[in-house]
Amino acid sequence: MIAFIEPFLASKSLANNSQQAYRYDLRQFCQQVGQRINPETLALYQQSLSSLTAAAKKRKLSTVNQFLYYLYQQRVLADYFKMDDRIEASFSLKPQLTRLDTSAFYAETAFLKGQLIALLILELGLTPSEIAGLRLADFDLGLQVLRLQSHRGIRVMTLSRTLLPFLERAAEAQQLYLFDHDAKPFSRQWFFNQLRDFLESIGCAELSAQSLREQFILNEKAAGKSIIEVAQLLGLKSPITLEKYYKM
């Protein structure tokens, strides 16, 4: 079925970002169901989306349904299949923050810069402004640490083995900044645009730099870090703003 993805995309008028997102979702779908498209394989595919947000789930189902209709029109499929993409809304007086399945953040992508920005927020809790100021000299990939200097002092952060390959690829360039624009950092808006394009490509358009930072907090809390330790990792003067995460 993978062979039909490009002809399907060519039949639609899609912006480049949307086309990348469609391609990612459809390759994921084809890898899961293989050549057998039937009610059973589609049900298993739907079940695999259960951990996603409602918006991401609806987007993936809509994309796959369009693809299934295309395959039926092209007589690749003898029967027309359509998955129910209606997502029941759930309401709560108090929004509940939960840890997300972030495996898609580490998958192969065409949006490499946006991916690295997302991972730096997700794994280290950095803000876009802090990321903009990162220099290659701040990293010691051999010792797997980042030394981030600010007016409040130096924060030493451990780089995970999962993050390391993404940094090693970026460090191959001979430049001053991790994200370098003629030996100067890019604008803050550039970082938000790169992050947005990547998040859209993996079906997580509803996420933001702030929500990824919240994931970092939740993950550190789940790992047993105290509120004081997380505040120090984030470079905060006080842990007051973190109290809501520890009262959950």
UniProtKB/Swiss-Prot annotation:
Domain Tyr recombinase: 92-248
GO molecular function: DNA binding; tyrosine-based site-specific recombinase activity
GO BP terms in the entry: DNA transposition
Highest taxon above the source species: Bacteria
Identification of the protein by name: Tyrosine recombinase XerD-like
One Pfam family in the UniProt entry: Phage_int_SAM_1
Subcellular location: Cytoplasm
Main location: cytoplasm
Family matches, as PROSITE patterns: CB, TYR_RECOMBINASE
Keywords from the named record: Cytoplasm, DNA integration, DNA recombination, DNA-binding
Active-site residues per Swiss-Prot or TrEMBL entry: R213, Y245
Keyword Cytoplasm: yes
GO CC terms: cytoplasm
Described purpose of this protein according to its UniProt entry: Putative tyrosine recombinase. Not involved in the cutting and rejoining of the recombining DNA molecules on dif(SL) site.
Species: Streptococcus equi subsp. zooepidemicus (strain H70)
CDD domains xref list: INT_StrepXerD_C_like
